């Protein structure tokens, strides 16, 4: 990661539905795949950079197995909490953005921001559901929902170990 000092933290408001978005992660995977394709068949194929890019692609590919519908499918239409209600819950995530407008955020920061807003959204769902239930017994479908949230959370956390090759390394 680049030095923190060139980035600032910006509170960003999301609805849960907006935050449960893996587009940025898929874009990063595609960018790394492009690197791999461009280096294939060249002398760069045996470099550390090639291996790192390849490794990043294979880790980021796990994003395809993340399916937020698994969460929404757990919610019955007539249940305690509706999917629409949950999707509309607003919260704030602190995302990092370069201090200089000329600078694009690094891949590591783009990934980190995506992981942050998805993880925050999952936590926000948990809190919302627990508040809504209060002291009531947790119904089966809510237990399944919590377990679906936990599964997705672990999948997202695995993406936190992805390392991107530097332009010049």
Language-model regions, residue ranges each:
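Long, low-complexity or tandemly repetitive, helically biased scaffold regions used
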Residues: 2-24, 31-169
